[in-house]
Amino acid sequence: MNILLKDFKYPESWNKSPNQSNQYIDQVFEDTNKIGIYELNNQDHYLYVENLLNVTSYLYPTFDKEQLRLCATYLHWLFLIDDFLEDEYNTMSEKQNDVIKSHAQILLTGQYLNSDVDVKPSEKLTMFLQNTSKDWAIKYNKFDVHNIYMTTLFQWLYSVYPLNKTTESTKPIHMDLYTFIRKVNIGVAGSIIVGLLADKDITDIDISKIWLNPIFTRIMENSTIQIGLVNDCASYDKEYANGGHITNPLYFLQVRDNLTFNETLNFIVNKCNQSIDEIIKDEQLLLKQLKDQGYTENQLNQVNIILNYNHNLIQGNINWSLISKRYNNHDGKPFIFENTKSKYI
């Protein structure tokens, strides 16, 4: 049994075509070439960046070229730092802590932890991200959003190793613990807040107040659950082939809870659809609460812009997962999906 794309429920209004602009790929490649990450004339390096960053068009379908560049800078950093931490320091606890501290220092202060030694390319990448965000905040007067953005990335840094360390246990990870870690580790909060930093339309509400609203927090958490599980489905075949499937729920639910593969698939689909239902309910609760607090119709419309950005992430993620070489197996197609239309609510 395969999961069909139509098994995942979405409101029809969430479905958007990818952004047609892709200049941001060349721009980010050139930016990071200056840092020393890539070789400018190396086609393999360029294809690697292209395969990573085409997700930007799916997650941010309504943004202009300048906004796409800002968001792509974040996504590129997220993917590279995640791979760097997992590949280079997966079993070296003391060095793990040192690496995390060095990147955290850059995010929080805009300064290197130890400038007396040679600065690593990965640290230069984090500094470039920090400076890019700060420059945007100055240009558009968004320092509150910039601060939330840096705090969110700081929290994400400390989520990478806890997930990896769950593989050290002789027992499979429990779904509740996995979900708790993935709420931060999947990077959805960063994807939302960088979109809000990039936004040029929200002018009449305080974004930070919406971000701190507990109902909006629950909306984001349900989004992370859904997006994380979709990515797990899309990447399972490749992870299994590479031996990286231990923390994938398609594997550990079978082992821990003695489920068949089909039962595991059904559980994941139901969990995803339940998350979507909860998001829709909470959106109405949030809008009603804000209206009762005196938000005008125009202000509520701007809150809806924020909610729509989240819809774009959810819907764009599953569409990108179908074609992503980051998740797909060797034949270019994730075994878990068939390319059919979404089932709308």
From Swiss-Prot:
Signal peptide: none annotated. Coiled coil: none annotated. A motif (DDxx(x)D/E motif) lies at residues 82-87. The keyword Metal-binding applies. It catalyses: (2E,6E)-farnesyl diphosphate = (3E,6E)-alpha-farnesene + diphosphate; (2E)-geranyl diphosphate = (E)-beta-ocimene + diphosphate; (2E)-geranyl diphosphate = (Z)-beta-ocimene + diphosphate. Induction: Expression is detectable but at low levels in vegetatively growing cells and increases during development induced by starvation. Expression is highest during the ultimate stage of mature fruiting body (approximately 24 hours after induction). It comes from the Eukaryota. SUPFAM superfamilies: Terpenoid synthases (SSF48576). It is an enzyme of class 4 (lyase). This is Terpene synthase 1. The gene is TPS1.
